[in-house]
């Protein structure tokens, strides 16, 4: 691993298992301890399998770990029968990328059983990279074969629930676009360098929620090194449609039509400027529905959006490189 990356003990995500709600109430909490150190030299591309880890339909999980901390399919007790091939292993590692004041905290989730050798950079919303729904979503993406890096875009100071509007606006003004852009570019270059050293894919995917979705557009527009092969923007905030003319890769936009932070007309404007882009709008859905659903309708839309996203990554990163 690159000398500028420092390995740290991986902090287990406290994930809320997203599935369709039933009359029984809120889904059970799921704790996953992903402690196995990640070694990029172990990344050997395998054929993509669409029968990935279906987290939406698992029920009544009881988790145990073996001596190495790895989760095994045989150690997951389910109320319903589940094919072992549907349950994938994911390992994780906490990182510090860069040096001194320019260092960036991040975590990397790696698919172990079905790794396809492709990297994805995931940019969080204002809640930060350690927000449980964000970790849960990153885990799901990794479970489908990808290697997912989630950086701390806020340098240890994400938005906190309960802040006043004035406090939020002051905090947001401190998140300088130049610094965030530099951190994103540093993480992208780090991933490319690691993948090249391992002799595998040289193209990355990039996913962004809300704040991260807005910066995803900026990152793709300035991507002169062509690090990214595609982007997926979930309800991006403060999108500048004019940036689309500088984007040379397909972009998938996912949003609800009841989202004040991501107007549908803005997405259709930028769609016209990006070749092979696509806009998917979910009727009645608000902000954040895909990674932090709050109703049965949100859950159903989130499941559908995840499937569309997964297929988009497959078609634009895996099919295009073969």
Show which residues each predicted segment covers.
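Short alpha-helix in the alpha/beta-hydrolase fold that links the catalytic acid
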Residues: 263-272
């Amino acid at each position: 691993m690159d000398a500028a990356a420092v390995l740290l003990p991986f902090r287990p995500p406290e994930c809320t298992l997203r599935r369709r709600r039933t009359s029984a109430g809120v889904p059970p909490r799921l704790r996953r301890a992903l402690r196995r150190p990640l070694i990029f030299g172990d990344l050997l591309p395998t054929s993509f399998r669409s029968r990935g880890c279906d987290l939406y339909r698992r029920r009544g999980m009881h988790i145990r770990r073996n001596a190495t901390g790895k989760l095994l399919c045989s150690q997951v007790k389910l109320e319903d029968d589940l094919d072992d091939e549907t349950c994938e292993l994911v390992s994780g590692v906490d990182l510090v990328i860069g040096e001194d004041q320019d260092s960036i905290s991040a975590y990397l989730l790696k698919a172990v059983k079905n790794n396809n050798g492709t990297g994805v950079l995931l940019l969080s919303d204002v809640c930060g990279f350690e927000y449980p729904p964000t970790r849960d979503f990153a885990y799901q993406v990794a479970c489908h074969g990808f290697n997912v890096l989630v950086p701390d875009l806020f340098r240890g100071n994400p938005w906190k629930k309960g802040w006043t509007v004035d406090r939020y606006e002051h905090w947001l003004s401190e998140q300088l676009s130049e610094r965030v852009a530099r951190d994103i570019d540093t993480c992208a270059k780090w991933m490319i360098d690691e993948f090249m050293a391992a002799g595998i894919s040289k193209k990355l995917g990039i996913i962004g929620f809300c704040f991260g979705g807005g910066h995803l557009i900026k990152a793709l527009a300035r991507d002169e090194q062509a690090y990214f092969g595609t982007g997926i923007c979930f309800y991006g905030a403060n999108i500048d449609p004019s940036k689309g003319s500088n984007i040379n890769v397909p972009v998938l936009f996912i949003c609800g039509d009841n989202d004040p932070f991501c107007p549908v007309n803005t997405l259709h404007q930028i769609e016209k400027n990006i070749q092979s882009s696509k806009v998917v709008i979910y009727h009645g859905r608000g902000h954040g529905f895909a990674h932090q659903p709050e109703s049965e309708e949100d859950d159903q839309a989130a499941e559908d959006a995840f499937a569309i996203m997964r297929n988009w990554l497959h078609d634009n990163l895996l099919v295009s490189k073969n």
